[in-house]
């Protein structure tokens, strides 16, 4: 089926994904994919389908690749706190790499996915974290009553903030600082630790 990521040849998917990263959805074209892949436009059209189908397939490929790289980092850790910290370090490193590229070229993968392919990314992310949260519950690392689905969504949203929000009190260029920042708060957050309500002073404009 043209445009179905499950049946598409990897080289064309990679070419489509790279084209999307470099040009963005607005400038993306089947001709550009053909030039990247070194094939004819007709081959791209017959394989990927329409321009929209090609973009969708490229986004799906990028989403799967991002989750795969995240999984590789996470699987090296044994506790939920360390797993989330490792994911945060990876996303922060990705953020630094994106910042070093020329403006208008090579759009960041995560930003691209969050803006245009967020449904697949969010679904895959939640499915990635659910068994890890359940394992943490079994180990007693987080509260037994923790809802794995809700906790996974919370982890996902927190991690994506490392890409979307600028640093204030934490040095995102330091993997050690990122690990400590996440490790100090992730378990307490999932355990629902209660703290006295503190009055926050309003900042003058």
Each PLM stretch: what is its role?
Residues 5-8, 125, 129, 148-155, ...:
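Short amphipathic alpha-helix in the helical subdomain of ABC transporter nucleotide-binding domains
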Residues 7-19, 33, 54, 58-66, ...:
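Generic hydrophobic, amphipathic alpha-helix propensity
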Residues 11, 32, 61, 82-90, ...:
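Amphipathic alpha-helical interaction segments
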Residues 11, 19-53, 57:
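Helix-turn-helix
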Residues 57, 68-101, 114, 152-155:
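Hydrophobic alpha-helical connector segments
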Residues 67, 113-141, 149-153:
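Amphipathic alpha-helical packing segments from all-alpha helical-bundle domains
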Residues 81-107, 119-130, 187, 191:
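Helical hydrophobic small-molecule/effector-binding pocket
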Residues 93, 127-139, 158, 164-205:
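C-terminal peripheral helix-coil segments that are non-catalytic and often amphipathic
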